[in-house]
Amino acid sequence: MYYPGPGDFNWALDTATALMQGRDPYAFEPSSLKVPYPLPVALFGAPFVALPKPLAAAIFFGASSGLLAYGILRSGEPWRLVVFASFPYIYALMFAQWSPLIAASWFFPALAPLLVLVKPNIALPVALNRLTRRGVAFAGGVLLVSLLIYPSWPWRWLEMTGEYARIVPLLTLPFGPITLSSVILGFGNVSPLGYSTRWR
């Protein structure tokens, strides 16, 4: 990875470590560059806390990429593997980001609701199009356990997201809603990956 250390996966490792040590994972001063993840992220970090952080992040990102590649090949459209040569993927690699795993959840829908508990800002659109009873039940169980461990974490987390450095594309692109509506009306309910999103 280009970025020193474990990149974005650091939050999973630090949250899991804090919980295992009986510490409050939200006991720090947030900033625009230091906004925590929801508590369920600890589920992903827990298996790796004993490893050096860069190695843990490399394994996580490699496994996420492998799962995405497997999902693409299983779908019977290997040309989609070109995504691994794209700049968004290279950028995600540099910072050990979650986007390959979220993309993989399109092919493995049971993962999608769980990832909403970790990265709601980008996982929600995938989850809403790929809902399964098993996925919702598993995510609900994880959420329940997280609340039993730390009942007030959702409020603590929301309080600390106020420093998040965000942009709202719809305000920077006034014709965004019109363009999106035209695409939907013109091409039907098609996902960014090219699959129909109609309920069956």
Describe the predicted segments one by one:
Residues 113-128:
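Transmembrane helices and adjacent periplasmic/lumenal helix-loop junctions
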Residues 1-109, 130-200:
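Primarily membrane-embedded glycan-assembly and transfer machineries that use lipid-linked glycans
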